[in-house]
């Protein structure tokens, strides 16, 4: 399983339509589920370096990147994926 965090930044278009953002977030969770991605949490982070963070788990990187391409095509957000490792996974790496 691949764990990670998707960092989300609103575009100008996304900022103009911010009131629709919670509905878009719910729709994005449904889109993720269709691709086999479990959304563990979705946090808005106003005032932070990013506008939101989505904690996910998936079978591999391909569905994650497909999800990001699909969601970003709306023009409301830009996304970056950061792989996350458990303590046990980190122990194996070091």
Question: Which residues fall in each region the model found?
Answer:
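Short S/T/G/P-rich N-terminal loop/turn motif that feeds into the first structured element of a domain
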Residues: 1-34, 38-40, 44-50, 89-94
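An amphipathic, aromatic/His-enriched active-site/gating alpha helix that lines ligand/cofactor pockets
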Residues: 58-88
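Short beta-strand-to-loop capping motifs
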Residues: 8-10, 54-59
